[in-house]
Swiss-Prot record:
The organism's taxonomic lineage, starting at the top: Bacteria, Pseudomonadati, Pseudomonadota, Betaproteobacteria, Burkholderiales
Name this protein carries in UniProt: L-ectoine synthase
Recorded superkingdom: Bacteria
Function recorded in the entry: Catalyzes the circularization of gamma-N-acetyl-alpha,gamma-diaminobutyric acid (ADABA) to ectoine (1,4,5,6-tetrahydro-2-methyl-4-pyrimidine carboxylic acid), which is an excellent osmoprotectant.
Gene3D superfamilies, per the entry: Jelly Rolls
GO molecular function: ectoine synthase activity
Signal sequence, renumbered to the chain: none
Family listed: Belongs to the ectoine synthase family.
The protein's annotated pathway: Amine and polyamine biosynthesis; ectoine biosynthesis; L-ectoine from L-aspartate 4-semialdehyde: step 3/3
Gene source species: Bordetella parapertussis (strain 12822 / ATCC BAA-587 / NCTC 13253)
SUPFAM superfamilies, per database record: RmlC-like cupins
Reactions catalysed, as given in the entry: (2S)-4-acetamido-2-aminobutanoate = L-ectoine + H2O
NCBIfam families linked to this entry: PRK13290.1 (NF009806)
Pfam family membership, one: Ectoine_synth
Enzyme class, first EC level, given as a word: lyase
Length: 131
């Protein structure tokens, strides 16, 4: 059994920070669950281009506000507590922070190793862990 507190990830290499978000990666590929599990905060007033070509992601919004805009059709969806969205078709999108920090719980398949950051195209590369 794996039991962790997200507080134990803070300040470690499993807490990844960019200009627009901070992600605490609680379960990773090395844990052998077949998915990774993260608590992420999107900073207010930010806009992040994302296009997960190699991963599927489900996101549960638990606090704050923001929006997601799909690039293919320009649709915008408001995000807030209780909203779930799934990028089941590797949907390219803009993730926008609102007036308050947007706190979300994310599940990725295949699982992340922990150190991924978006490249210039908004993609997480498939990363193999060192043996």
């Amino acid at each position: 059994m794996i039991v962790r507190n997200v507080k134990d990830v803070m300040g470690t290499e499993d807490e990844v920070r960019t200009d627009t978000w901070v992600s605490r990666r609680v379960l990773l590929k090395k844990d052998g669950m077949g998915f990774s599990f993260h608590e992420t905060t999107i900073f207010p007033g930010t806009r992040t281009h994302i296009h997960y070509k190699n991963h599927l992601e489900a996101v549960w919004c638990i606090e704050g506000d923001g929006s997601i805009e799909t690039i293919a059709d320009g649709k915008t969806y408001e995000l807030g507590p209780g909203v779930v969205y799934a990028l089941n078709e590797n949907d390219e999108h803009w993730l926008c922070g609102g007036k308050q920090p947007l706190r979300v719980i994310c599940v990725f398949n295949p699982p992340l190793t922990g150190q991924e950051v978006h490249d210039a195209e908004g993609v997480y590369a498939l990363v193999e862990e060192a043996a």
